[in-house]
C-alpha cells in the first residue's frame, strides 16, 4: 500500500486509487464488433466445449445492415466458426434470436428479427447442423443491447444471437 504525506502531515493512502485502476481493467469488453470474443480480457480461459468457449472463442452474434437480412462476409465467417463448433459438440441445442434496431414499428421489427433469425438458421443448416437442434425466436426491437438515438447503437441492435440452450449426453469431443 502506498502512502504519501499531504500538507499538515496527514498520511493519505492510495490503495483505493490503485484498486480503482485495477478494476477499470476488468471492465474491458469481451466481444469484438464481429461477435467474436477475442476482445481484451477474453480468449483461451474458457473450458473447451463449454457455452463460455462458444461465446468467447467462436462468437455468438452476427450483425446486419439497416433493413436487411443479407449476411455480410464477417457474418458468414462467424457462422462458419459456429457451424464448426456445433458439429464438434453435437450435444448442444440452441436458439437463434433475431433482433432489430428501434426504428420502425413493433410489428415490422418483429418480422425483420424473425427473418434474420431464419437466415442464420438456414445458413447453419446449409453447413450441416441438424434442424432438430435449432429453434428461432424474434425479439424485434424489444431487447436492445445499446440504447441511444444514434447509428452506433442501432448497428449493435441489428443482430442475430446464437444462444446455447443446453447439452445432453456425453461430450461430443
Task: Name each model feature, range by range.
Residues 2-16:
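Bacterial N-terminal signal peptides that target proteins for export
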Residues 28-93, 165-173:
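Periplasmic peptidoglycan-binding/tethering modules of Gram-negative envelope proteins
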Residues 146-150:
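Short beta-alpha junctions and helix-cap segments that line functional grooves
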Residues 74-81, 107, 111, 115, ...:
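Extracytoplasmic/secreted proteins, especially bacterial periplasmic and envelope-associated proteins
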Residues 152-156:
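A generic structural micro-feature
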Residues 90-99, 114-145, 158-173:
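A non-catalytic structural micro-motif
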Residues 22-26:
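C-terminal motif of bacterial Sec signal peptides marking the signal peptidase cleavage site
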